[in-house]
From Swiss-Prot:
Disulfide pairings: none
EC number(s) recorded for this UniProt protein: 3.1.26.3
Subunit: Homodimer.
Origin superkingdom: Bacteria
Nucleotide-binding in keyword set: no
Gene: rnc
HAMAP family xrefs: RNase_III
RNase III domain span: 5-127
Source organism of this protein record: Pelagibacter ubique (strain HTCC1062)
Protein name, entry field: Ribonuclease 3
Length: 222
């Protein structure tokens, strides 16, 4: 059994005027093939992007576009959405098909997508200003902690590999899935003496950065 959605409203200090759109934002297509959260997720993804982009411009008015773009990608990707969704325990409230009524573990992508759907529902019910406050409240510590060292992971890994092994890192595209408007890339990277490190991203470039970051973490923890 799922936890009552009203508890989620109380936890997040929300009060939806339209309860139907709130429940819809928590409904996966496996539970209801018609009234599910796919389209609201599409909207929520755009609203999240708008708010984060606006905040980054306010914080870094003189920063180069390329750096802003990478900061942006690190704040709106699936990994970050999942991290925030887990923090508010969103997975407890998602409606998914469970024919045997057993305790199941919901896929990470479904949880991350549901957070975007919830954002879309808040926007439709409360408007942009309220949604902006909601997003910035959840993302504030992540925005201030967005560090350039992680953004430049691919460059750092390349420099390390050339210095130590005299060859470039090897990147391999594992998969490209998801709908056209919301692709999900999986990329693996390895150095001459390492295993492959795999990560995902909303673009191939983003996935490569995330994989490079994992590889660097492994190198420097030794």
């Amino acid at each position: 059994m799922k936890t009552n959605p009203i508890k989620l409203e109380k936890k997040l200090k929300l009060k939806f005027s339209d309860q139907k759109i709130f429940i819809k934002s928590l409904t996966h297509k496996s539970f209801d093939s018609i009234n599910n959260n796919e389209k609201i997720e599409f909207l929520g993804d755009r609203v999240l992007g708008l708010i984060i982009a606006k905040k980054l411009l306010e914080l870094y008015p003189d920063e180069k576009e390329g750096v802003l773009d990478k900061k942006f990608a690190s704040l709106v990707n699936k990994k970050k959405c999942l991290e925030i969704a887990k923090k508010i325990e969103l997975e407890k409230y998602i409606l998914v098909l469970n024919p045997k009524n057993k305790k199941i573990e919901i896929e990470d992508k479904i949880v991350a997508d549901c957070l975007e759907a919830l954002i879309g529902a808040i926007y439709l019910d409360k408007g942009l200003n309220f949604t902006e406050r909601f997003i910035l409240n959840l993302w504030s510590e992540h925005i201030t902690a967005s560090v350039i060292t992680q953004i430049d992971a691919k460059t750092k890994l390349q420099e390390y590999s050339l210095k130590i092994f005299k060859v470039l890192p090897i990147y391999k595209l594992i998969s490209n899935t998801g709908p056209r408007h919301k692709p999900l890339f999986k990329v693996a990277v390895k150095l001459k003496n390492t295993k492959f490190f795999t990560a995902e991203g909303t673009s191939k470039k983003d996935a490569e950065q995330n994989a490079a970051s994992l590889c660097l973490q492994d190198i420097f923890k030794k």
